[in-house]
Amino acid sequence: MASLSTITQPSLVHIPGESVLHHVPSTCSFPWKPTINTKRIICSPARNSSEVSAEAETEGGSSTAVDEAPKESPSLISALNVERALRGLPITDVDHYGRLGIFRNCSYDQVTIGYKERVKELKEQGLDEEQLKTKMDLIKESYTILSTVEERRMYDWSLARSEKAERYVWPFEVDIMEPSREEPPPQEPEDVGPTRILGYFIGAWLVLGVALSVAFNR
């Protein structure tokens, strides 16, 4: 009875990974075993330093390649630019022909020639690297627009509409038609034999008709 009158006190049981207060009566008639929560930790196989460095170099190389990728020039073909051209408003204030030093109705070959000449002039000016890159980007932008059929058509159409807003111009009216560089196929000589025979036959019938008409009138 003395054991029953004893006041039970909570005891602190230490469990690996956790600390939990368990109320363990001191008058238990059976042996008490603390429960231990076990946790499984899955460890990935160790990799050597060469694999880690190779992976780091791959990631670094891909990011560098993305950063160094050339930026494409913005396209002039958009719904907003089409709407502005229809209203007779300019879609850009850049004179792409003036940048390359060429005329509006020049051929595509002349666009390439003008681009190469402008690049040569810029390199001979002795500009620093940053200024040269800035001007080269502008030259490349103009060359890309004027050397692409769809982009140049949109640009020329906008120029034609903004110059004469009261007169509507179709986009294909401003296309630069490239002259054919192929020689035309040789023409076959026309066979005039059947035509000549037909003419002789009709002439003979006319002569015969006149002769018969004169004979019957006598």
UniProtKB/Swiss-Prot annotation:
Range annotated as the organelle transit peptide: 1-53
UniProt main location, coarse: plastid
Molecular function as annotated in GO: quinone binding
Sequence intervals crossing the membrane: 197-217
Domain J: 95-159
The reaction(s) this protein catalyses: a plastoquinone + NADH + (n+1) H(+)(in) = a plastoquinol + NAD(+) + n H(+)(out); a plastoquinone + NADPH + (n+1) H(+)(in) = a plastoquinol + NADP(+) + n H(+)(out)
Gene disruption phenotype: Malfunction of the NDH complex.
InterPro entries tied to this protein: J_dom_sf, NdhU_chloroplastic
Keywords for this protein: Chloroplast, Membrane, NAD, NADP, Plastid, Plastoquinone, Quinone, Thylakoid, Transit peptide, Translocase, Transmembrane, Transmembrane helix, Transport
Region entry Disordered, spans: 47-72
GO terms for cellular component: chloroplast; chloroplast thylakoid membrane; NAD(P)H dehydrogenase complex (plastoquinone); plastid
Enzyme Commission identifier(s): 7.1.1.-
Gene3D superfamilies: DnaJ domain (1.10.287.110)
Entry's localization field: Plastid, Chloroplast thylakoid membrane
Record's bilayer topology term: Single-pass membrane protein
PANTHER family: NAD(P)H-QUINONE OXIDOREDUCTASE SUBUNIT U, CHLOROPLASTIC (PTHR47726:SF1)
Role noted for this protein: NDH shuttles electrons from NAD(P)H:plastoquinone, via FMN and iron-sulfur (Fe-S) centers, to quinones in the photosynthetic chain and possibly in a chloroplast respiratory chain. The immediate electron acceptor for the enzyme in this species is believed to be plastoquinone. Couples the redox reaction to proton translocation, and thus conserves the redox energy in a proton gradient.
Subunit structure: Part of the chloroplast NDH complex, composed of a mixture of chloroplast and nucleus encoded subunits. Component of the electron donor-binding subcomplex, at least composed of NDHS, NDHT and NDHU.
Protein name: NAD(P)H-quinone oxidoreductase subunit U, chloroplastic
Provenance organism: Arabidopsis thaliana (Mouse-ear cress)
